[in-house]
Amino acid sequence: MLDIKRIRTDFEAVTEKLATRGVDAAVLNEMKEIDAKRRNILVKVETLKAERNTVSAEIAQAKRNKENTDDKIAAMQNLSAEVKALDAELAEIDAKLTEFTTTLPNIPADSVPVGADEDDNVEVRRWGTPREFDFEPKAHWDLGEDLGILDWERGGKVTGARFLFYKGLGARLERAIYNFMLDEHGKEGYTEVITPYIVNHDSMFGTGQYPKFKEDTFELSDTNFVLIPTAEVPLANYYRDEILDGKDLPIYFTAMSPSFRSEAGSAGRDTRGLIRLHQFHKVEMVKFAKPEESYEELEKMTANAENILQKLNLPYRVVALSTGDMGFSAAKTYDLEVWIPAQNNYREISSCSNTEDFQARRAQIRYRDEADGKVKLLHTLNGSGLAVGRTVAAILENYQNEDGSVTIPEALRPYMGGAEVIKP
């Protein structure tokens, strides 16, 4: 959530920045007018309350003097009625301002490339060289079916489209991947957490999914509960409405969880395979940091995600998202895109974002600065470390052999009971 004071005092700059995210200046102008009206009403209310207090004191004095107070009582009643009417108007204005501030996206950092969409993203670096096959590489969904480790047909029968069963060494591979990821993040100082997989609406508001993106979630009917779209939601809300000690920052959390997404806007996209599912496992990283340290922490978090891909020897590239492609809550985002041979393309496997104080303001997560003792909003960061199903897809395609088998990456073999190959 944006700071109304920042919008008020730096209006032109904020308007210019949000325009790069598709926010019409008319929206901010309307917000500015409503805010000005609110402040004018507040002045009137304070003036009327002061007058009412004066009249109240005069009534008390008149009663002590045994004087008639009818006129003064009538005047005080009129003042109270005016205050009540203005308070009601203020409540309506506050509701409108809240609607504005909770639906506006975060202000992009100065270092974010300006652009309309993903075509304006900027490649930062690449790692590894895509393998040159001397045979036609299969898509991971065909490999999975041929190996008997991925079953979309029965997933569709039991549930519906974009669901599947992992079987045998496929299930073992999925488990090996997320255990490996959690172990690697643990070495980097992350505390492993098992979170609730169901959260309340306040938590969804805190991280920015609600109210704007309700259609993308699975709500439990007639309850205040939602299936988590990512472990970011419970992790980032862990300290909601709390004040932390500044000396304890930064704090690192990691968790593996299922993620549930309706993919409301993705009809017709990635209808086959593991790239876009309604339910998938993901290892998440979340950080709580001081404002002056958060961008250094973003670079570290991105490196932590890269470490997984490097140890799995999967070629990838790092991309800085443009203002038009970033997520709602992000001030800056790096995407990691892994090479998918059958698509001859890089596909997203991780997003690492600094939300600055956007989520912290919504969730009221603060810290007491040990230097001056003041309570301040901290910065939150989140990143995929990594999407597990997409990692399975990348391994199947990059490690496939001409006979249809798939070599298991060396880093995962200790988690696979020493198995080296998945054979048909």
UniProtKB/Swiss-Prot annotation:
Its EC number is 6.1.1.11. CDD domains: SerRS_core. ATP binds at residues 261-263, 348-351. It is an enzyme of class 6 (ligase). It catalyses: tRNA(Ser) + L-serine + ATP = L-seryl-tRNA(Ser) + AMP + diphosphate + H(+); tRNA(Sec) + L-serine + ATP = L-seryl-tRNA(Sec) + AMP + diphosphate + H(+). Pathway: Aminoacyl-tRNA biosynthesis; selenocysteinyl-tRNA(Sec) biosynthesis; L-seryl-tRNA(Sec) from L-serine and tRNA(Sec): step 1/1. InterPro entries: aa-tRNA-synt_IIb, aa-tRNA-synth_II, aa-tRNA-synth_II/BPL/LPL, Ser-tRNA-ligase_type_1, Ser-tRNA-synth_1_N, SerRS_1_N_sf, SerRS_core, tRNA-bd_arm. One of its GO terms (biological process) is seryl-tRNA aminoacylation. Keywords: Aminoacyl-tRNA synthetase, ATP-binding, Cytoplasm, Ligase, Nucleotide-binding, Protein biosynthesis. It is found in: Cytoplasm. GO terms for cellular component: cytoplasm. Catalyzes the attachment of serine to tRNA(Ser). Is also able to aminoacylate tRNA(Sec) with serine, to form the misacylated tRNA L-seryl-tRNA(Sec), which will be further converted into selenocysteinyl-tRNA(Sec). This is Serine--tRNA ligase. The gene is serS.
